[in-house]
Amino acid sequence: MRISSELRALRADPAAQRQLQDNVQAAKRSWLGQERVALMFRDLEQFAKGAELQACPALEHVFTAPGIAASVTEGLLAELLPAMRANNFAHPPFPYQYSDGLAIMELAAVGNVRLSLMMLEGDALHERGEARSISFADCERHEVIVAGKASARIVRRTGPDNGPARLDFEPVELVPGAILSIDGPYSTRLVDHVPSRLVTLRLTRVPVLPEPSREYRLSDGVLVHQSSGDRDESRAELAMALLGKMGRKDAAPVLARMALSGSDNFRWQAIRECLALDAAEGFRVLTHVSRDMEDTLAAPAGALRAQLLESYPQLETVECPA
């Protein structure tokens, strides 16, 4: 592997590495010190504490007044881009990620509130092909188009949460200055076409106890996936699924304990994964849940227990908790 002489020299000089990063951090501090940005970040603190957006004027103006979001973003780029060019081995001073044509830079994270600058590449969106499903997350979301354009749809759903949904579509053209506000788990937006790139400034706030995120098939509204709306539970669900794929039977007792607390959706997933890894351990916790009449999962747990006993009578011999 070829390593440039500049990079080789930098690897041998930790002080120079720190200086590069300090230079970029100085650009970040300069942007944060701008009056409009400082007021916006002050309001972010109040927004994260539960204040309505209308009660946070500096923040509200960014997502309602024409040109403010572009001005804030241009101010950031005016500080950050020269610093990154002059210190091209430094990392951006904000958390960032890039995957499948979607780049996200997190400008602020305060409690359950996130302020992010996002960029979607049209070529990558085209390569994915036509969307077959749409996800609805329980969060308040405000977006301003900073640059680029796109054809999109606002998607609204009605019907039962755990069954087929009726999906209604409203076409929208996203152009610089366009503003979208989406609140709650019953509406979202779907980008269909981006000629080049779409740059968006996004503000999100997740409730303290969010509803599960739900994914529906676009063609008929069938529910195809449901996951916890809580970040910690969502990460735990991914870990449970990974343990299941790995066949980690030794994790079954841990999953059994996880099945006793948390949201109903999370607990049900823990029961299923526990059953798949260790039928006896899973059946014990399933029985425990089914016998607790105060438990909101008692009825579905009892129904599943009856089905399993019908198919696998030998489970009747499993010693279950009192």
Annotate the PLM regions.
Residues 117-137, 173-175, 182-185:
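Conserved short histidine dyad/triad with adjacent acidic residue
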Residues 142, 157-189:
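Short acidic-glycine-tyrosine-enriched beta hairpin
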Residues 236-245, 268-277, 299-310:
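Structural detector for internal amphipathic alpha-helices that build alpha-solenoid repeat scaffolds
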Residues 137-152, 156:
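Short, conserved beta-strand element in jelly-roll/cupin
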Residues 141-142, 179, 193-213:
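A short hydrophobic beta-strand segment most commonly corresponding to one strand
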Residues 232-233, 249, 263-268, 295-296:
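Alpha-helix N-cap/helix-start positions at coil->helix boundaries
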Residues 218-224, 248-259, 279-290, 313-320:
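Amphipathic alpha-helical scaffolding segments comprising HEAT/armadillo-like alpha-solenoid repeats
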